Amino acid sequence: MIPGNDPILLTPGPLTTSPATRHAMLRDWGSWDAAFNRMTQSVCTDLIEIVHGENEYVCVPLQGSGTFAVEAALGTLVPRDGRVLVPNNGAYCARIVKVLQRLGIAHVELPLREDAPVTAAAIEDAFNRDPRITHVAQVHLETSAGLLNPLDEIAAVCKHYGKSLIVDAMSSFGALPIDLRRGGIDALVSASGKCLEGVPGMGFVIVRRSALEACEGRSPSLALDLYDQFAYMQKTTQWRFTPPTHVLAALRTALDQFIAEGGQPARGARYARNCAALVDGMKALGFETFLTADVQAPVIVTFHAPRDPKWQFAEFYAAVREAGYVLYPGKLTQVETFRVGCIGSIGTNEMHDAVAAIGRTLIRLGIRVK
């Protein structure tokens, strides 16, 4: 447990935040105040620097969850006659398909197994089969299982074929290396409440300036128009509509801690240690991972559920919650699984303690794993 006896959130976001991040939300901010506007700009500057986009990219923050930002990116950046390829190996890829359907944007779905990352060859084949494809909407880290898709290879093939790549980096931004200097990526979407260890409530799109400047009047939405949001901020330094002031203040503090920790390499290394501690401990209890180690991202791990007839996830979840650890409820894979996150303001001590709590819960409920 963290100070105050709050539970540890072993989820991919919202997640356990530091006391300093929570404390940052105790101050009220005026949404048109110059100090708040400077804070917005400083946050955007840092977000761009994390992915090395200083020269060609701009950051557009947006009120709401990460999905709001994904929908804003698709609705703004894809023209009316565009056609989007969506490699689909999980629930968040499927959500992109649903967004495109609602927006009335033509798209091609590339179905994949839940445990199989997309390959550059598969995307190249899709381009050759359908030359009308103009864009690719790619989830970097498919959080439904913790599957890592090979972003650099995908970006390279998109660049080679002249296709625009929009990346959902919701659960990878800040934890895994992303370098926009390599080219091939037009837009990168993430949110405050994931690996940056802020709180939920703000998405953002880091987008190539030249791509965004060609999008005036394209979005079918007022609130989710990235071009208007950016143009208004450039003109006034303010948000178009009421900003999530406390969320932004928390993110500013979270970014300060991110930088002090050593940036993405250090954050990613801590999460990797957490993941290793979790996997080793769960395997010692008899659990098996859903993914192989070579495609497992150090953010959330999916485990096969025990075959013991006494296993009931709801009962298991409640018992682990009572012990002070909140797992991710429910499964998103087709087979019977459950997920445990390893990100947030936690370290290996918390992971070891969580595994011990899970072990005690299994004994208490009389569940055999092996």
Curated annotation (Swiss-Prot):
Catalytic reaction list: (2-aminoethyl)phosphonate + pyruvate = phosphonoacetaldehyde + L-alanine
Q: Which GO terms describe its molecular function?
A: 2-aminoethylphosphonate-pyruvate transaminase activity
Classification via InterPro entries: Aminotrans_V_dom, NH2EtPonate_pyrv_transaminase, PyrdxlP-dep_Trfase, PyrdxlP-dep_Trfase_major, PyrdxlP-dep_Trfase_small, SP_NH2Trfase/AEP_transaminase
Which Pfam families is this protein grouped with?
Aminotran_5
List of residues that carry N6-(pyridoxal phosphate)lysine: K194
Top-rank taxon? Bacteria
Q: Which cofactor does it need?
A: pyridoxal 5'-phosphate
What keywords appear on the UniProt entry? Aminotransferase, Pyridoxal phosphate, Pyruvate, Transferase
What EC number(s) does this enzyme carry? Answer: 2.6.1.37
For whether the record's keyword set contains Transferase, the answer is yes
Read off the SUPFAM superfamilies from this record: PLP-dependent transferases
**GO annotation, biological process:** organic phosphonate catabolic process
What does the similarity note say? Belongs to the class-V pyridoxal-phosphate-dependent aminotransferase family. PhnW subfamily.
Q: Which PANTHER family match?
A: 2-AMINOETHYLPHOSPHONATE--PYRUVATE TRANSAMINASE (PTHR42778:SF1)
Q: Describe its partners and assembly state.
A: Homodimer.
**Primary role:** Involved in phosphonate degradation.
Protein name, entry field: 2-aminoethylphosphonate--pyruvate transaminase
What phylogenetic lineage does the species belong to? Answer: Bacteria, Pseudomonadati, Pseudomonadota, Betaproteobacteria, Burkholderiales
